[in-house]
């Protein structure tokens, strides 16, 4: 348990693999992106991408595509194209290149676990915001992220965030679905796991692609200009609320509460 988790009752709310909510009624879902929304571990991620790519293709990763709003699966195929590597089935065990890459990426990232806090950082206000939104009445929290699930868990655990999210109902980078579909699948997963109707959902993220995915899925979006997209970009993309960062916890909570308010449940 990290020092962040030790004194936070909310961090013990989600026991992965169970549907225990402590007797709370669930009626709204708060979903978060991870990279450049909650944490910045780009340096470690790039190193892991390069190692996994080399192990699968036998070639160095010379060119890496833009990462914002993209899944690890998308990044792999775009990297193949950028580096002139043909996409084909591996001769080893009949596993395709993507399956091998996902495995190698997990291994490469786990090997760099100790570097996450050394070469990465928790973004300002992220811990407080995640803790506060987890405490909203009727709220259930998870992540919809481009990272594969093991790596998402590594990132959240390293910075004391993991306990605020039910990772079982999240959307991850190995899933063969666009981000908008992942958001909808998380809503369905939450309803099935907790046997409760989710009346409203909000997605907190940092890129234009994330905002567009939320609009496609029909969920509300709080965009945080902590990544590559500017406040102007995020507003133009159609975010319901745009924040410069997460440092004003009350502002984050007010926006999440307002966008997921269900009159009959308040």
Q: What is the predicted function of each stretch?
A:
Residues 14-68, 74-81:
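Active-site neighborhood of HAD-like aspartate-dependent phosphohydrolases
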Residues 81-132:
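Metal-dependent phosphoesterase signature
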Residues 203-241:
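Acidic, Mg2+-coordinating phosphoryl-transfer loop and its flanking beta/alpha structural elements
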Residues 171, 241-246:
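Short acidic-hydrophobic, aromatic-tinged amphipathic segments that line or gate anion-handling sites
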